[in-house]
Amino acid sequence: MSNFQAALLLTLLAGLSTGIGSAMALAVRHTNKRFLALSLGFSAGIMLYVSFMEIIPQSQEALSAGLSAKAGAWVSTISFFGGMLFTWAIDQMVPSFENPHEMSMIGPMTDAEKSDTRLHRMGIFTAAAIAIHNFPEGMAVFFSALSNQELGIVIASTIALHNIPEGMAVAVPIYFATKSRKRAFSLSFLSGLAEPLGALVGYTLLRPFLTPFVLGIVLASVSGIMVYISLDELLPSAEEYGEHHLAITGLIAGMAVMALSLLLLT
């Protein structure tokens, strides 16, 4: 399997985890929120640590090969904040009501108080919002895996984990509005396909220019995307699902596991 195929497969698997979240929401009546909080904090810890300790140094090394060390550090830093700005801009495209970063957390599957029409609309717009947000996430997984497959597996796993509650957020309102498990699952599943689509779009646009210098810029931008996702989505969601100390415990554990794995791999 080529690097391209492996990177695309990892991105596809990460995106399709929204379908896992949908299946979980439709199969069980209660979500174990404490475990979810710990898991989301764990994912944030992994993504933050690997961004600062692995991806940014790789970016600076690639950029410094064609520039001076100082110039490479400057370009890497600007690209890092550019990645954050790019993800923030996508966030602003989605109204807060439909934005998965702003919506209320998922509760038990009880009778809905709102009308079926409103619930159905909420589910549709949530699916669209998640699809938009999955574009930069797909690029983050794909380009990380293209640079380093082991790193790509780690990032794909953490993105997949945080896609699970997003799949739940799509499935629950659609199911209550339509009483159709098939429709709820299908919409959630389709929203996840935006992740490999984002990877393909990014690769198609950048492929003619994908030199080591450009890859260094992309890696720094990817780290910015990952840090933004961790701070804007994973940690706030972990705290809302569980409690502050549980989220921080997961965060520290994720960092420790990532640090140990990097030490063992080097």
From Swiss-Prot:
Q: Which GO terms describe its molecular function?
A: metal ion binding; zinc ion transmembrane transporter activity
Could you tell me what this protein is called?
A: Zinc transporter ZupT
Query: Where is it predominantly found?
Result: membrane
Localization per record: Cell inner membrane
Q: Which residues bind Zn(2+)?
A: E137, H162, E166
The protein's annotated catalytic reaction(s) are: Zn(2+)(in) = Zn(2+)(out)
State the function annotated in the UniProt record: Mediates zinc uptake. May also transport other divalent cations.
Classify the source by domain of life: Bacteria
Q: Entry's PANTHER family? A: ZINC TRANSPORTER ZUPT, ZINC/IRON TRANSPORTER
Which family is annotated? Belongs to the ZIP transporter (TC 2.A.5) family. ZupT subfamily.
Q: Which InterPro entries match?
A: ZIP, Zn_transptr_ZupT
One short Pfam name that applies is Zip
Alphabetical GO CC annotations of the entry are: plasma membrane
**Protein topology in the membrane:** Multi-pass membrane protein
Q: What are the alphabetically sorted keywords of the record?
A: Cell inner membrane, Cell membrane, Ion transport, Iron, Membrane, Metal-binding, Transmembrane, Transmembrane helix, Transport, Zinc, Zinc transport
Q: Summarize where Fe(2+) binds, as residue positions.
A: N134, E137, N163, E166, E195
| Stretches that traverse the bilayer | 8-28, 36-56, 71-91, 123-143, 152-172, 185-205, 209-229, 246-266
